[in-house]
Amino acid sequence: MTVTEPVLHTTAEKLAELRERLELAKEPGGEKAAAKRDKKGIPSARARIYELVDPGSFMEIGALCRTPGDPNALYGDGVVTGHGLINGRPVGVFSHDQTVFGGTVGEMFGRKVARLMEWCAMVGCPIVGINDSGGARIQDAVTSLAWYAELGRRHELLSGLVPQISIILGKCAGGAVYSPIQTDLVVAVRDQGYMFVTGPDVIKDVTGEDVSLDELGGADHQASYGNIHQVVESEAAAYQYVRDFLSFLPSNCFDKPPVVNPGLEPEITGHDLELDSIVPDSDNMAYDMHEVLLRIFDDGDFLDVAAQAGQAIITGYARVDGRTVGVVANQPMHMSGAIDNEASDKAARFIRFSDAFDIPLVFVVDTPGFLPGVEQEKNGIIKRGGRFLYAVVEADVPKVTITIRKSYGGAYAVMGSKQLTADLNFAWPTARIAVIGADGAAQLLMKRFPDPNAPEAQAIRKSFVENYNLNMAIPWIAAERGFIDAVIDPHETRLLLRKSMHLLRDKQLWWRVGRKHGLIPV
């Protein structure tokens, strides 16, 4: 039996119908679904958007969308979409609605998100997805899969054009993880956000493996794999991190990031002078590279990106004289700063993202080289180190390198060497630049002795190490040969970075050869 819509004659009746429909669209899943959500302590899809964007700035699009010809269709079709402002700049936002078909992807869901992505490309603004979805809508069969593919195609079109960000606030399974993994930043809430292609039950049935939900797709585990870039403790912290991240970025690849408080502290400060004593006298003693970073950039402001993956390298954003720079720094607190597979991938990805949005790069170097080991070789250190190298050369933004202490072997090359197109290279007097460290060179020497542990051999070893550190692993040879532009007092670093970025602000590369694209090692 078909229900006939009442014929409305007056404007007042039409306005009343509009209000009734909009009220129904606020909670399309009904009171029961809303109560179930509230009992779990989960905010509504709209409440999440309101907390992310600037107050009063959200304009919803498609609230009255629903699948045509479906008697069970609900308004919104499982997703809230619209436009708002973050830090006063436009963004596109969508948020999955768990009360409508579990936030799964259906026909109008796909159309709404696809249109939002096209709008972001058209106006040149970031897109942020708040993800809490059950994946594909089974009852929609191939239609749901088709829309996943359609959205995937649009992610590729937006890639490198505008920033794409995903916030994971629930159990995102199957198709629901393919969109987030294509975005530039993935933020998840600990013990709330999960990502996996197939759940524990399916894995048990297919392979016989027993695995818990947390082990399989928990935020911390996925962060260690490099799939999630920031794990936070609450939804509020996730929204704040996204706001902070976007504050360092341009709205699109043709724009420039906001300039924040330029001209601060134009003279050397007490914090600058602390750099003169920050590097330990012993080469084998660790220190936290963050202590250096907080002193060489504006306001001690540094935003870590992907802190839980590849911890031998720190990546993140800071400002030099109010302007954004991307930072790639070794972390002596983790494996002495030796670069492993995960750190290589992390650095390569960060460099390519920064280059896509024309963000200058600063390399801060203290590494004994690439991490040796059978597992590293099995897992592709050659190829993955090659990606790192490729990304550094490919990036044509301004690049400045500060060598603080160790810079050995192949790691010397990838950490912003002049030979890989760095524009300006500086070193502290504490820098040790060589093919290999003194201890490694001594190990090679000891192979000549029948008994390396003999007192005579050990005395020769000690003398060799001292001589190597005094005459080989020093910054002066690199400076003499033009590989280092200047050896500087550590306390000069912050202001020297400022001068360098001013000089390089209008950097142009006229010698680039026209081609479709190079082939990164994959």
Curated annotation (Swiss-Prot):
<comment type="subunit">
    <text>The biotin-dependent long-chain acyl-CoA carboxylase (LCC) complex is composed of AccA3, which contains the biotin carboxylase (BC) and biotin carboxyl carrier protein (BCCP) domains, and AccD4, which contains the carboxyl transferase (CT) domain. The complex also contains the beta5 subunit AccD5 and the epsilon subunit AccE5. The four subunits are essential for activity, but AccD5, together with AccE5, probably plays a structural role rather than a catalytic one.</text>
</comment>
<dbReference type="InterPro" id="IPR051047">
    <property type="entry name" value="AccD/PCCB"/>
</dbReference>
<dbReference type="Pfam" id="PF01039">
    <property type="entry name" value="Carboxyl_trans"/>
</dbReference>
<dbReference type="GO" id="GO:0016740">
    <property type="term" value="F:transferase activity"/>
</dbReference>
<dbReference type="GO" id="GO:0015977">
    <property type="term" value="P:carbon fixation"/>
</dbReference>
<dbReference type="InterPro" id="IPR011763">
    <property type="entry name" value="COA_CT_C"/>
</dbReference>
<keyword id="KW-0808">Transferase</keyword>
<dbReference type="GO" id="GO:0071769">
    <property type="term" value="P:mycolate cell wall layer assembly"/>
</dbReference>
<comment type="function">
    <text>Component of a biotin-dependent acyl-CoA carboxylase complex. This subunit transfers the CO2 from carboxybiotin to the CoA ester substrate. When associated with the alpha3 subunit AccA3, the beta5 subunit AccD5 and the epsilon subunit AccE5, forms the LCC complex, which is involved in the carboxylation of long chain acyl-CoA. The LCC complex can use C16-C24 substrates, the highest specific activity is obtained with carboxy-C20-CoA. Has low activity with acetyl-CoA and propionyl-CoA.</text>
</comment>
<dbReference type="GO" id="GO:0005886">
    <property type="term" value="C:plasma membrane"/>
</dbReference>
<comment type="similarity">
    <text>Belongs to the AccD/PCCB family.</text>
</comment>
<dbReference type="GO" id="GO:0009317">
    <property type="term" value="C:acetyl-CoA carboxylase complex"/>
</dbReference>
<dbReference type="InterPro" id="IPR011762">
    <property type="entry name" value="COA_CT_N"/>
</dbReference>
<dbReference type="InterPro" id="IPR034733">
    <property type="entry name" value="AcCoA_carboxyl_beta"/>
</dbReference>
<dbReference type="InterPro" id="IPR029045">
    <property type="entry name" value="ClpP/crotonase-like_dom_sf"/>
</dbReference>
<feature type="domain" description="CoA carboxyltransferase C-terminal">
    <location>
        <begin position="270"/>
        <end position="503"/>
    </location>
</feature>
<dbReference type="GO" id="GO:0004658">
    <property type="term" value="F:propionyl-CoA carboxylase activity"/>
</dbReference>
<feature type="domain" description="CoA carboxyltransferase N-terminal">
    <location>
        <begin position="11"/>
        <end position="261"/>
    </location>
</feature>
<dbReference type="GO" id="GO:0003989">
    <property type="term" value="F:acetyl-CoA carboxylase activity"/>
</dbReference>
<protein>
    <recommendedName>
        <fullName>Biotin-dependent long chain acyl-coenzyme A carboxylase beta4 subunit</fullName>
        <ecNumber>2.1.3.-</ecNumber>
    </recommendedName>
</protein>
<dbReference type="GO" id="GO:0009274">
    <property type="term" value="C:peptidoglycan-based cell wall"/>
</dbReference>
